[in-house]
Amino acid sequence: MMTGEQLHQLLLDKWGCSYDVQLRKVKGKIFVQVMWKYLEQASFPLSPQEYAENLNAIANYLNAWNGAEQLKSFIEKTRERPRLGKAVSIQVDLGERTSEWIL
């Protein structure tokens, strides 16, 4: 199980910033995308509370998909980092549950 707070700490430990995290569905696959915008930027569109709520929602999806450990492992091992115009995309393997989540 992962909480939004743990996801936030994972981002801080890896990259030192509170990067925005989004879910994307592409060609029947789910990706977690760590975006290049981050909470500490003056132009960041979310308040700290909205940011925390977003991370909690994403953590809840990851837990439902049994994908929290996949995400944690990928972030810990990757050499990629978010940069302007390029997110870090992490595919979440839904296994046999794919049909339940992908319409």
Predicted features and spans:
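Intrinsically disordered, low-complexity linker/tail regions enriched in Pro/Ser/Thr
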Residues: 1-22, 86, 90-103
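General structural signal for secondary-structure boundaries
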Residues: 2-4, 47, 68
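Secondary-structure junction/capping motif
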Residues: 2-3, 29, 72, 83
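Exposed alpha-helical structural elements
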Residues: 6-10, 57, 70
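Charged, amphipathic alpha-helical linker/scaffold segments
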Residues: 8-54
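Basic helix-extension-helix modules of the SAP/HeH family
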Residues: 17, 21-25, 58, 76-79, ...
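Short secondary-structure subsegments characteristic of cysteine-rich extracellular domains
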Residues: 49-65
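Intrinsically disordered, low-complexity, Lys/Arg-biased terminal tails
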Residues: 61-103
